[in-house]
């Protein structure tokens, strides 16, 4: 059977990863799991469940595809539907157990022991034989990542609970966080999506719970919470901290009880803690309904250093196997199963398909802010603070020049002051020590300049409002329109152009009504939008009609005066010469 699979795989291109998968036969039992050869021969990361032949037996199916070129994710809807919409399970409440955490920390390795339990849960020796290779989700030793996107086991287990109900159990494996090919957004999306869709999220950590582990958890869960609809309760269900390679059993013993004591100590909010540390812990408590922790010993040197290790129990330390026998039933025993709920309602297999579709669309869009690395977030905050400080220097200085209690200042003087103070603000910005480098900081300097120009435009309007002639521009314009229409109406009526006279009277009436309305708005402060509209119309008339007309008349008058002066001068000169000749 393995040879047939190998031949089928050779015929498929690597792009087959995107091909739609066929649903496995759920009646296939444990024999398929235990009869496979080592994972290196049976399942490869690039050959996940692409052919009908492979799909006839239980195996991992990638339902969320990771595109490395554009750092985007795609849901394989058909594969997910074929797994969860099988007739015998689609209306059952679902239990989703997911394992997430940093890459190369043994998530897939742990899930394969969960598979052994699910196929042999009625046996005391479910953990397997000493010489049996570990198969199921693909895993291997080494330092490079193995899993990408999100995978699920294509056989959904139907379990009878002690209360007589049946539930469907789905096991989920996720792409490891913080590898060299994933952005912070990639890591946050995978972790958030798996947390949103799982009822139990196992947070797989190595050796200890570091403060940065909690900060990343805060970031990832907040990214998930933002994508969910407005809810008034804790958005996620159970988070199980799984501390691998625990080296301090003399302080906190292996297992659940020692983990509980350790977690209480780590997540305790103390009065003397910095506010940032308190906020991280409060956020985690507010996001999850249940928190737990399990301390797991190191599996042994053979596991860590043997390149040919294939999961055989004979190579694993007894302490690890003993605690593993306690951990897996704690998560998957019928009496311990946690059914998936969203907003207090149980979720069926059919419902979960729709939630997956809705959530992936959110993360494919641009509605959510992009999470950033700590350096980038700190650099942005640092530069924004420098921008705010420099802008404040500019605003305070300009207030001294043309603030509310200062008299009107000539526009040319105001512009000169603006340019001087703008340069002072830019020097202030440049003098602040900032993170991110020159190119990064240049964007914020451009932002500062734009904000200063916007503020300057407001100061110009404020200064113009103090000019009595500017304040009287609207009534003067309307009065000029009324006067002009009155004269034109009289002249056109006198020569018999009654239609034009009526039109001029109508315009004069509108101008008079506008003038009265404007006066009422300025007096009462009501209907300010109407007053603004009248000001804008008057401004347009002034700039486009009256001012050019006045300038032309002024130029014509000046030109005529100069011409007359020249003529008078020439006449005087000619007269003077004539008198001289006569004399």
From Swiss-Prot:
| Reactions performed catalytically | GTP + H2O = GDP + phosphate + H(+)
* Parts of the chain on the Cytoplasmic side: 1-476, 521-583
Region feature N-terminal hypervariable region (HVR), mapped onto this chain? 1-60
Regions annotated as coiled coil: 256-284
Q: Which domain of life is it from?
A: Eukaryota
> Region entry Disordered: which residue ranges?
1-45
Give the Lumenal membrane side ranges: 498-499
- Name the chain's protein: Atlastin-2
Positions of region (Linker): 466-474
Q: Where are the transmembrane segments?
A: 477-497, 500-520
Chain positions covered by the region annotation 3HB (three-helix bundle) domain: 374-465
Q: Where in the cell is it found?
A: Endoplasmic reticulum membrane
Its Gene Ontology cellular component terms are: endoplasmic reticulum tubular network membrane
Q: Where is the composition biased (Polar residues)?
A: 24-39
State a single Gene Ontology molecular function: GTPase-dependent fusogenic activity
Binding positions for GTP per the UniProt entry: 104-109, 244-245, 303
């Amino acid at each position: 059977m393995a040879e047939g699979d190998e031949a089928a795989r050779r015929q498929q291109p690597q792009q087959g990863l995107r091909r739609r998968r066929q649903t496995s036969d759920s009646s296939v039992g444990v024999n398929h799991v235990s009869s496979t050869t080592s994972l290196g021969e049976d399942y490869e990361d690039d050959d996940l469940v692409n052919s009908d032949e492979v799909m006839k037996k239980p195996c991992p199916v990638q339902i969320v595809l990771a595109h490395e070129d554009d750092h985007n994710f795609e849901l394989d809807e058909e594969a997910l539907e074929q797994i969860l919409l099988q007739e015998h399970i689609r209306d059952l409440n679902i239990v989703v157990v997911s394992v997430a955490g940093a890459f190369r920390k043994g998530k897939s390795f742990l899930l394969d022991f969960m598979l052994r339990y699910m196929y042999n849960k009625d046996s005391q020796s479910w953990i397997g034989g000493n010489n049996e290779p570990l198969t199921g989700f693909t895993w291997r030793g080494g330092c490079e990542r193995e899993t990408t996107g999100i995978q699920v086991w294509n056989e959904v287990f139907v379990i009878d609970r002690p209360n007589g109900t049946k539930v469907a159990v789905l096991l989920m494996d996720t792409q490891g966080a913080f590898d060299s090919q994933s952005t912070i957004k990639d890591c946050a999306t995978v972790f958030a999506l798996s947390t949103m869709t799982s009822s139990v999220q196992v947070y797989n950590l190595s050796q200890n719970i570091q403060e940065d582990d909690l900060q990343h958890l805060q970031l990832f869960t907040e990214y998930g919470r933002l994508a969910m609809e407005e809810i008034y309760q804790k958005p996620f269900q159970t988070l199980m901290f799984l501390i691998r390679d625990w080296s301090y059993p003399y302080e906190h013993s292996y297992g659940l009880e020692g983990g509980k004591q350790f977690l209480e100590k780590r997540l305790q909010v103390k009065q003397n803690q910095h506010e940032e540390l308190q906020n991280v812990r409060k956020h985690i408590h507010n996001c999850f309904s249940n928190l737990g922790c399990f301390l797991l010993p190191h599996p042994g040197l053979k596991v860590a250093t043997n390149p040919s290790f294939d999961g055989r129990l004979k190579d694993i330390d007894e302490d690890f196997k003993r605690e593993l026998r306690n951990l897996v039933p704690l998560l998957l025993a019928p009496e311990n199963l946690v059914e998936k709920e969203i907003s207090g309602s149980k979720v069926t297999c059919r419902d979960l398909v729709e939630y997956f579709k809705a959530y992936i669309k959110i993360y494919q869009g641009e509605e959510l802010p992009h999470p950033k690395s700590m350096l980038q977030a700190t650099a942005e905050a640092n530069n924004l603070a420098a921008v705010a400080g420099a802008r404040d220097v500019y605003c305070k200085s300009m207030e001294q020049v043309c603030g509310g209690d200062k008299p009107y200042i000539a526009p040319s003087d105001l512009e000169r002051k603006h340019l001087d103070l703008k340069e002072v603000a830019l020097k202030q910005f440049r003098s602040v020590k900032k993170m991110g480098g020159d190119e990064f900081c240049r964007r914020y300097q451009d932002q500062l300049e734009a904000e200063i120009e916007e503020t300057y435009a407001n100061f110009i309007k404020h200064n113009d409002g103090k000019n009595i002639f500017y304040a009287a521009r609207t009534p003067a314009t309307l009065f000029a329109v009324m006067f002009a229409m009155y004269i034109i109406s009289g002249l056109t009526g006198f020569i018999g152009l009654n239609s034009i006279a009526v039109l001029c009277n109508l315009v004069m009436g509108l101008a008079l009504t506008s003038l009265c309305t404007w006066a009422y708005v300025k007096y009462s402060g009501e209907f300010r939008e109407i007053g603004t509209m009248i000001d804008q119309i008057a401004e347009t008339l002034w700039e486009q009609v009256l001012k050019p007309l006045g300038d032309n008349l002024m130029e014509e008058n000046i030109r005529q005066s100069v011409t007359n002066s020249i003529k008078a001068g020439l006449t005087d000169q000619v007269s003077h010469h004539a008198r001289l000749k006569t004399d």
